[in-house]
């Protein structure tokens, strides 16, 4: 069941329910995500840790799944991991940075957990790209498969990749999937 709410109501609901993973889709329907279990939480941490180390060395700002972004289509989304270039982040006001940043990240990662519906995550990835995200990875540990989404290109499906390359969006970033598949 999806409940329609006003965007301004979402911010209040999200702030009052910080212990819940909430998103608002472009149709202003509230989406409640299943809580993350230990295995998915451990895998998410490995992804955000690798991205965070790269960010500390090369710049920009990286975020974990608790950050909600206001996308251009009106959706409020919280990817499992994301990154924004420093120049784009600095273009936001301090108030925008403190709230739900009104910006599509340059890069996003969604990690499929056992309770996630694959087609729902795939639709979310398409939404990210249409909102301006340059590179997105949908990591599916169950099938040891990664779907790579890029601006202006068809989705690429990688079977059992060991390392993902950040390409021109994140030059030099390589995400090791070895412990993600465990």
Positions of PLM-derived features:
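Gly/Pro/Ser/Thr-rich low-complexity, intrinsically disordered segments predominantly at protein N-termini
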Residues: 1-182
């Amino acid at each position: 069941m999806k409940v329609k709410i006003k965007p301004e109501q979402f911010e209040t609901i999200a702030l009052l329910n910080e212990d819940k993973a909430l998103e608002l889709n472009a149709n202003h329907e509230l989406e409640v995500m299943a809580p993350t279990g230990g295995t998915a939480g451990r895998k998410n941490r490995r992804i955000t840790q690798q991205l965070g180390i790269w960010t500390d060395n090369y710049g920009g700002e990286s975020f974990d799944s608790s950050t909600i972004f206001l996308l251009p289509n009106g959706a409020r989304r919280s990817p499992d991991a994301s990154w924004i270039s420093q120049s784009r982040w600095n273009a936001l006001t301090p108030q925008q940075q403190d709230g739900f940043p009104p910006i599509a990240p340059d890069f996003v990662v969604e990690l499929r957990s056992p309770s996630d519906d694959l087609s729902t995550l795939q639709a979310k990835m398409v939404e990210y790209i249409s909102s301006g995200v340059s590179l997105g990875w949908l990591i599916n540990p169950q099938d040891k498969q990664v779907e790579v989404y890029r601006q202006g290109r068809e989705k690429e499906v990688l079977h059992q990749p060991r390392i993902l390359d950040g390409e021109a969006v994140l030059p030099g970033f390589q995400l090791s999937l070895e412990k993600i598949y465990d």
